[in-house]
Structure formats: C-alpha cells, structure tokens
C-alpha cells in the first residue's frame, strides 16, 4: 500500500506522511504534483494525507474520508430514532459495525460509552484517526468523537472473547442489501466494507454479551429482522428500519 500527500504539501506534511507510512506498514511516495488519476495509474489505490485528515482513494477514484456531517445534523435534531431505542443514558454500547461512525457518534453524544468495532483495515485507519483528530467548533461533537474507543476486529471474534453481559447494548448496521441513495462516502466505502450478513452464531454470542438488548438497522425490504427474531420498528416513509431484541426478561 502507498501513502502520499495532498498537492499542498510542505516539509511537515511530508514528515507526517513518512511517519504514518511506518505506522501503517505502507510505502511513502512523493506526490510530485501528480494528479489523482496519475497517482492511481502509478500506485493503484492509495492513502492520501491532507493537513487535517487521512483519506483513501479507491481504484474508481472515489475518496473515503472522515467527516461527521451526518452525525452532527442528527445530534442537533430534537429527536433521533436510534437514541430513543437506547433508553436512559448512560449505557455501555458495543457498535459492532463502526463504518463511518455516524451511529457511534450519535450514541456517544447522547451520553453513552461507546466501543466501536471495524474489521476492514482501510476503513478503520481512516475513521479511527478522524475520530481522534478531527477539529470542530462543536464541542459536543468533538467530545463524542474523542470518547469513542475504536477497535480493529471482526465482531464475532471480539464477541467470543467477551464476558457474559459485558455491554448493556449491542448494535449492528451491516451493509445494506439494497441501495438507498447516492452518497460520495457511501460509494467510497462500498468496495472496502465487510458485506457479511448477520448469522445465528453471531446472534447467539451477541445475546450472551449484551445485558439489555440488541439493536440492528437494515433496509425495510431486508428479511434479517424476521430471520433472526427481531421486533421491527417501522419508520413511516423511511427506507431504513431498526430491529430490537429485548434481553432483560430472558435473563431474569
């Protein structure tokens, strides 16, 4: 894997890129004012370091970057469907599918302690570093970003290593079985993401590790809710539904 810098490079940015290359096990290549198309031609998919963020350029030239704009809008809204399902905060929450971290951020901003898992290395590197370094004047959002513990792991392996009732709530937002709408970051994450569906083995481990409930999100046409026994939370005029599996009564 290659890492290079934005065109607005200086000695400090080059030094950071070289250090990051060592950290990522990647090779640093000077930008030499090459266009992104020329970089792709020479390097294949590559990391791109800007002054304020790390991005990844896919083979189709789509750019994966961290930006909490969607989460910021949801945090400022008077109501959020996911937050309403969590119950009274603070809760300990395991987000088993971090992705772009929008849901993790919304849950953390609501006062919960969030641990977020990401199995795919490129997504983990871009998003976890964004959570740790992204600067904003929105102090609530910045506090939420810094509070999230991001861990590179597939969810099943992580769950198997946890004690019973280790988290209050488990959350999963697997890749959509249906396309919702075009979004640059969603398009960029698609070729990098883990497209695995949730399985009975995953659910059994999740039931053991979660103390209160498991929440999933999927397209309204997805049959995962019925397949795994989740109570579908219908959201009128919304293409994404949540599913909830309450556990407290089963464990009492």
Predicted segments, located by residue:
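Mobile active-site "lid"/loop adjacent to the S-adenosyl-L-methionine
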Residues: 174-202
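S-adenosyl-L-methionine
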Residues: 1-93, 109, 117-169, 235
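Residues at the starts of beta-strands that form the adenosine-phosphate
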Residues: 92, 112-113, 147, 212-213
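Conserved beta-strand/loop positions that form the S-adenosyl-L-methionine
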Residues: 96
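Short, polar loop motifs at secondary-structure junctions
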Residues: 33, 99, 218-221
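Conserved Class I SAM-dependent methyltransferase catalytic core
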Residues: 199-246
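Conserved SAM-binding loop of SAM-dependent methyltransferases across substrates and taxa
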Residues: 100-112
